[in-house]
């Protein structure tokens, strides 16, 4: 059988999981399971304990960490035990000093030495002056030996004249229980040292007292008193074990909460970091921060805004680079759509790496065009140099595509320096873009360039300061725009050897570490893997992997690099699992140490006397905190009453009141216990009782009342027994001899005070009440016993002392000798008793123990409040992290489709990894504002063009708001390109895009399959109506030119480091041509699209054949409207943004 076995108690498991379990986000790539089991230890010295008391964490490393934490927490309670020992020494000093005589010198000196040692030990432990190993391994046992020695020295030196079986039994029981609640040891050693102490104490008393017995009757009385001692010790040990279990469970709960909270926090932080990295790979940080700030605004604040928020910033003196693949059409014809996208993905991933190397901000990828900017958002003086180096590296990088495809592809690069307006437009699918006349110039610089060369403008040339050799570019001869604007252009001469040196010097060594060349040409292989959901993932191997493959081709014995990589990945995951577990445990230990050193309660968050939180709201939250261990606390009261009854029955077996109070009290306490445990085990009790129990747990005054009832029952049982005993054994009063008392409880009345000590123990076990309530209850116990000791039982204790110490004197003479403050006789002899009268010593003992337990209760409440504050702090931290994650997630899903964002947030992706999804039946739409170019100016009246873009932002935002309509839920915005809006329908793989219940395409009719295309056509008509509404309100005359098409596409993301979602294929190209060759104010479609949409009631006008670049002549139609209204899910029409409804 294994050492640890799964814990199978259904009740406990349900409660434990309900208290401690948390929902952890799935994280398959972490490599380590985040669920840890609470098991039962089936070996060791505590095997005799119940299963629920033998808890252990799995794995063993977690249990070891917990034991370190638990002992560290208990180390502070060790100081409490030192205080207990010091109070006991003070008690002995007082008891010896008030009746000082020559025979009291030895116990007085021993107690004084013990007190000094206690103080020294307290200071050493408090200040941390002892080595950690000594403090945790040696001091607990040393303190136990010191306390045990003090008890036995007090027993042997103070009671040397006449020993009794009850001597120091109360103190022994007190310290045995104290060992369980204070010593920073495991349960097994505490049980062992406690049992050893009790056995030795019992044997010493039994042997010593037995030597003084003179007849058989006294022997029977001794036997009953020894058995009473055993029950006192047994009660202290049982309740001590339960208190240890309760403390262990409370700390396990705090530890597990800390562990799981740290796991969740780390997981959320990791996911939040992934989201932030993804977000910042698409948007610059200053734009993303501004967006997050606005997203957190209240809806009321947003409603007060007159216009939609626009995130646009002006950046001056930046260099803009446009790069286009020359021969892309030839390349497209040589590759399938998927192969082409994989090729572009790998190429643009390399460009992204180069962009990071040369401090470029990638703006967008438009088909085969790549453009970026240097000097944004942070200004760089060498922005022009960086852009030139970037262009040269891109020209060199395209060579591997040329070699692989055996085509004449090349790069044409244009660079211009000027001012841009950078930001995002619209409210959905945010993408960072730049606008300005200088951006147009940079675009024309690329168009007027030469393949394989970097074409720069005069403004860029002015920023180079002679860093590169150039030659005239003559761009005006190849581009009418450049010729019209009179822009001088140049071509970079990159053939000279000093270019690499210039690259390093121009970047001050920052871009090219260790003198590495700008780029390294390679011809990597493209690996494709098909996923079950139909998506294709492709990874381009790095240059190092390509070299390995070449080596493998030359040498057949060379190991397969792919297989080695897979094996290495598997080994890395195993190592990562172990490292993650070790890292988490280390972080947990640091977090726990940080908590402990924070001393949160000592920062005056609480009042000094009452220990209540200064914040009333915090105090209210603490007061309603449920205490799951209240049932165990009340069960301790039942154990205490049982042992109390056994002790009293053994001392006085003839007194019937002992039996009656035991039965009645036990029944009442069982009722209280059941009512408290119903909330812990709800399936075992009626619903009404469970509800009542839960109400008690969360209601402070009800908890206090329940606790007071339990202690009141214990006190009344003891008081009734004491008073009944007095009445039963009181004989007739005689003037000469006093009260004649004999038999039963009169033989040793100290035991009734000892059982009161058990009532004090039961009081501090009440975990659901505050230390002030416990103090009140302990004052009740101590006050009741004190009143009986000093008044009702005064003659009882006097008679007991007389029989023990002055057997031959009459009671009146003995009473005279028992005066504590009497002076020595005239003859020089001491006529006082050798001890303080028992009625006073027992009373003082009760008060000392009460003060000790009150001190411990304050410590326990401070710990409980500290754990509560830790819990609140951890909860608040998780809430803050979760809130940030939620906003980041909202921002990320507004930049990428949700299913695509989940793919990239799930695990770390390689830079060249491709996410793609093939679709056979998709609708694509392009909608542009051709006359916006005439509207846009950069005059000062328009704030350099910003106000023009603000108006464009309003138009695009209104288009975006249409997508919130349930009718258009199947439509996905792809992107905006300047003033062109691109959308598609049916590109969400995990949603039934057609809105019908048919599960397979074969089972659907054509009308079902193409419903999303009809929705896209309705969306295009709604965009036209929206623009008309905007024109009417702004007195403008903007017109849309829209093109639509249907067919198959490949949707996916290019570049995992800087993901760019787009769709590719012939369908997209034709839709784009339908827009560019269209007529303003019309929606142009090809014949295949017209045939499908006609079935949905759309009206068309035949335009006729038109020439489309790359496609020849195509028959096209203009979509004019719809005869039948669209079938909206709720029967309502589309509400246009800012629509003004005319009242009849």
Swiss-Prot record:
Keywords: ATP-binding, Calmodulin-binding, cAMP biosynthesis, Cell membrane, Cell projection, Cytoplasm, Glycoprotein, Golgi apparatus, Isopeptide bond, Lyase, Magnesium, Manganese, Membrane, Metal-binding, Nucleotide-binding, Olfaction, Phosphoprotein, Repeat, Sensory transduction, Transmembrane, Transmembrane helix, Ubl conjugation. GO terms for cellular component: acrosomal vesicle; apical cytoplasm; ciliary membrane; ciliary necklace; cilium; cytoplasm; dendritic knob; Golgi apparatus. Residues 534-543 have a biased composition (Low complexity). Detected on cilia on the olfactory epithelium (at protein level). Detected on cilia on the olfactory epithelium. ATP binds at residues 324-329, 366-368, 412, 975, 1062-1064, 1069-1073, 1109. The chain crosses the membrane at residues 80-100, 105-125, 139-159, 173-193, 226-246, 381-401, 631-651, 662-682, 706-726, 755-775, 777-797, 833-853. It comes from the Eukaryota. N-glycosylated. Sumoylated. Sumoylation is required for targeting ot olfactory cilia. It is an enzyme of class 4 (lyase). CDD domains: CHD (cd07302). Residues 504-563 are annotated as: Disordered. The keyword Membrane applies. The keyword Nuclease does not apply. Binds 2 magnesium ions per subunit. Is also active with manganese (in vitro). There is a cross-link at residue 465 (Glycyl lysine isopeptide (Lys-Gly) (interchain with G-Cter in SUMO3)). Mg(2+) 1 binds at residues 324, 368. InterPro entries: A/G_cyclase, A/G_cyclase_CS, AC_N, Adcy, Nucleotide_cyclase. Glycans are attached at residue 734. One of its GO terms (molecular function) is metal ion binding. Disulfide bonds: none annotated. It is found in: Cell membrane; Golgi apparatus; Cell projection, Cilium; Cytoplasm. This is Adenylate cyclase type 3. The lineage of its organism: Eukaryota, Metazoa, Chordata, Craniata, Vertebrata.
């Amino acid at each position: 059988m294994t050492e640890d076995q799964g814990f199978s108690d259904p009740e406990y498991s349900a409660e434990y999981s309900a208290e401690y379990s948390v929902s952890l986000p799935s994280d398959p790539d972490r490599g380590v399971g985040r669920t840890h089991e609470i098991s039962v230890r089936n070996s060791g010295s505590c095997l005799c304990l119940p299963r629920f008391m033998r808890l252990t964490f799995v794995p063993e490393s977690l249990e070891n960490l917990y034991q370190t934490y638990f002992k560290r927490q208990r180390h502070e309670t060790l100081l409490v035990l030192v205080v207990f020992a010091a109070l006991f020494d003070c008690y002995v000093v007082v008891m010896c000093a008030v009746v000082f005589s020559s025979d009291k010198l030895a116990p007085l000196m021993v107690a004084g030495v013990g007190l000094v040692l206690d103080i020294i030990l307290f200071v050493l432990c408090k200040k941390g002056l002892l080595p950690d190993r000594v403090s945790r391994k040696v001091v607990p046992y040393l303190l136990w030996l010191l306390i045990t020695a003090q008890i036995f020295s007090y027993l042997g030196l103070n009671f040397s004249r006449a020993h009794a079986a009850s001597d120091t039994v109360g103190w022994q029981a007190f310290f045995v229980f104290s060992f369980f609640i204070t010593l920073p040891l495991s349960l097994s050693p505490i049980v062992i040292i406690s049992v050893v102490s009790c056995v030795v104490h019992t044997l010493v008393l039994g042997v010593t007292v037995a030597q003084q017995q003179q007849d058989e009757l006294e022997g029977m009385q001794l036997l009953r008193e020894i058995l009473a001692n055993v029950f006192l010790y047994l009660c202290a040990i049982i309740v001590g074990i339960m208190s240890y279990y309760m403390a262990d469970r409370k700390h396990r709960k705090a530890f597990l909460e800390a562990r799981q909270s740290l796991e969740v926090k780390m997981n959320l932080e990791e996911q939040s970091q992934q989201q932030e990295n993804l977000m910042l790979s698409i948007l610059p940080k200053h734009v993303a921060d501004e967006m997050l700030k606005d997203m957190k605004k209240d809806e009321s604040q947003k409603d007060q805004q007159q216009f939609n928020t626009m995130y646009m910033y002006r950046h001056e003196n930046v260099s803009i680079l446009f790069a286009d693949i020359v021969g892309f059409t030839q390349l497209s014809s040589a590759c399938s759509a998927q192969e082409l996208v994989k090729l572009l993905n790998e190429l643009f991933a390399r460009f992204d790496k180069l962009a990071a190397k040369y401090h470029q901000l990638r703006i967008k990828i438009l088909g085969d065009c790549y453009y970026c900017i240097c000097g944004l958002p942070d200004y760089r003086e060498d922005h022009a140099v960086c852009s030139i180096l970037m262009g040269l590296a891109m020209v060199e990088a395209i060579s591997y595509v040329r070699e692989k495809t055996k085509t004449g592809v090349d790069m044409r690069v244009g660079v211009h320096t000027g001012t841009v307006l950078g930001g995002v437009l619209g409210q959905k699918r945010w993408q960072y873009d730049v606008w300005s006349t200088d951006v147009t110039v940079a675009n024309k610089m690329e168009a007027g360039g030469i393949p394989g060369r970097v074409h720069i403008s005069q403004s860029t040339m002015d920023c180079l300061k002679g860093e590169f050799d150039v030659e005239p570019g003559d761009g005006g001869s190849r581009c009418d725009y450049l010729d019209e604007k009179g822009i001088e252009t140049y071509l970079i001469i990159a053939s000279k050897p000093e270019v690499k040196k210039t690259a390093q010097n121009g970047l001050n060594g920052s871009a090219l570490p260790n003198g590495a060349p700008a780029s390294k040409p390679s011809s990597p292989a493209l690996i494709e893997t098909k996923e079950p959901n139909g998506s294709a993932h492709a990874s381009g191997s790095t240059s190092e992997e390509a070299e390995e493959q070449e080596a493998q081709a030359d040498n057949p014995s060379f190991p397969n690099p792919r297989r080695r990589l897979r094996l290495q990945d598997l080994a890395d995951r195993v190592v990562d699992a172990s490292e993650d577990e070790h890292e988490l445990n280390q972080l947990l230990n640091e977090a726990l140490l940080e908590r402990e050193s924070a001393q949160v309660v000592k920062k005056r968050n609480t009042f000094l006397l009452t220990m209540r939180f200064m914040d009333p709201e915090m105090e209210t939250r603490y007061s309603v905190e449920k205490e799951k261990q209240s049932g165990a606390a009340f069960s301790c009261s039942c154990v205490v009453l049982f042992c109390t009854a056994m002790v009293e029955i053994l001392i006085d077996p003839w007194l019937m009141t002992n039996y009656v109070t035991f039965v009645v009290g036990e029944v009442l306490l069982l009722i209280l216990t059941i009512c408290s445990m119903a909330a812990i085990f709800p399936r075992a009790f009626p619903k009404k009782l469970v509800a009542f129990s839960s109400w008690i747990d969360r209601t402070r005054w009800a908890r206090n009342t329940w606790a007071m009832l339990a202690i009141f029952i214990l006190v009344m049982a003891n008081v009734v027994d004491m008073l009944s005993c007095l009445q039963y054994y009181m004989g007739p009063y005689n003037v000469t001899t006093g009260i004649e008392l004999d038999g039963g409880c009169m033989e040793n009345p100290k035991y009734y005070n000892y059982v009161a000590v058990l009532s004090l123990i039961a009081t501090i076990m009440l975990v659901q009440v505050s230390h002030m309530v416990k103090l009140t209850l302990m004052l009740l116990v101590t006050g009741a016993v004190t009143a009986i000791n000093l008044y009702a039982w005064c003659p009882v204790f006097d008679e007991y002392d007389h029989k023990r110490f002055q057997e031959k004197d009459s009671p009146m003479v003995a009473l005279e000798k028992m005066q504590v403050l009497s002076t020595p006789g005239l003859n020089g002899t001491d006529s006082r008793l050798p001890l303080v009268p028992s009625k006073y010593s027992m009373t003082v003992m009760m008060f000392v123990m009460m003060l000790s337990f009150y001190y411990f209760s304050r410590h326990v409440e401070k710990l409980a409040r500290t754990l509560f504050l830790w819990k609140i702090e951890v909860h608040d931290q998780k809430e803050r992290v979760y809130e940030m994650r939620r906003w980041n997630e909202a921002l990320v899903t507004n930049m990428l489709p949700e299913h695509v964002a989940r793919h990239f947030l799930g695990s770390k992706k390689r830079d060249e990894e491709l996410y793609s999804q093939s679709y056979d039946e998709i609708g694509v739409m392009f909608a542009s504002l051709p006359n916006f170019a005439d509207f846009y100016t950069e005059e000062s009246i328009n704030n350099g063009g910003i106000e023009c873009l603000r108006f464009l932002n309003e138009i695009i935002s209104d288009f975006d708001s249409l997508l919130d309509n349930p009718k258009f839920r199947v439509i996905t915005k792809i992107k905006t390109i300047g003033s062109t809006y691109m959308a598609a329908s049916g590109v969400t793989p995990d949603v039934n895009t057609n809105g019908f219940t048919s599960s397979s395409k074969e089972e659907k009719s054509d009308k079902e399959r193409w419903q999303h295309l009809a929705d896209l056509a309705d969306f295009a008509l709604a965009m036209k109506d929206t623009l008309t509404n905007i024109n009417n309100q702004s007195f403008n005359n903007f017109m849309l030119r829209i093109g639509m098409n249907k067919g198959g596409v490949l949707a996916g993301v290019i570049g995992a480091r800087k993901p760019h979602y787009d769709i590719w294929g012939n369908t997209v190209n034709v839709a784009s041509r339908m827009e560019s060759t269209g007529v303003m104010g019309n929606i142009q479609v090809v014949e295949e699209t017209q045939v499908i949409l006609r079935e949905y009631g759309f009206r068309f006008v035949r335009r006729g054949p038109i020439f489309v670049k790359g496609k020849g002549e195509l028959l096209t139609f203009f979509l004019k409207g719809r005869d039948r209204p669209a079938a909206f899910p709720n029967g309502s029409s589309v509400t246009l943004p800012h629509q003004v409804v005319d009242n009849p």
